[in-house]
Amino acid sequence: MSDILERVRKIVIEHLDADPEKVTEKASFIDDLGADSLDNVELVMAFEEEFDIEIPDDAAEHIQTVGDAVKFITEKTA
């Protein structure tokens, strides 16, 4: 498992108090992990802080799953 995926999973588990077994790359923050729109904003802010990147609002709208977050962060930090 990649370092980025592990770090994203840790953030999601902590922020959403999610079951670690449910936090997979395909897991939707809203549909699978019970997040609401405010949770999504807080997750994006946590990703920005953890990885020292900026996620524009238009990009943040497309980050709906753990895998989406990992892909975006991987591209920004490459």
UniProtKB/Swiss-Prot annotation:
The record's account of how the chain is modified after translation: 4'-phosphopantetheine is transferred from CoA to a specific serine of apo-ACP by AcpS. This modification is essential for activity because fatty acids are bound in thioester linkage to the sulfhydryl of the prosthetic group.
UniProt main location, coarse: cytoplasm
Biological pathway: Lipid metabolism; fatty acid biosynthesis
Keywords assigned by UniProt, alphabetized: Cytoplasm, Fatty acid biosynthesis, Fatty acid metabolism, Lipid biosynthesis, Lipid metabolism, Phosphopantetheine, Phosphoprotein
Modified residues (O-(pantetheine 4'-phosphoryl)serine): 37
Disulfide bridges in this chain: none
Cited InterPro entries: ACP (IPR003231), ACP-like_sf (IPR036736), PP-bd_ACP (IPR009081)
GO CC terms, sorted: cytosol; membrane
GO BP term, pick one: lipid A biosynthetic process
Localization annotation: Cytoplasm
GO terms assigned for molecular function: acyl binding; acyl carrier activity
Domain Carrier: 2-77
Role, per record: Carrier of the growing fatty acid chain in fatty acid biosynthesis.
Similarity annotation: Belongs to the acyl carrier protein (ACP) family.
HAMAP family membership: Acyl_carrier
The name this protein goes by in its record: Acyl carrier protein
Source organism of the structure: Caulobacter vibrioides (strain NA1000 / CB15N) (Caulobacter crescentus)
Gene field: acpP
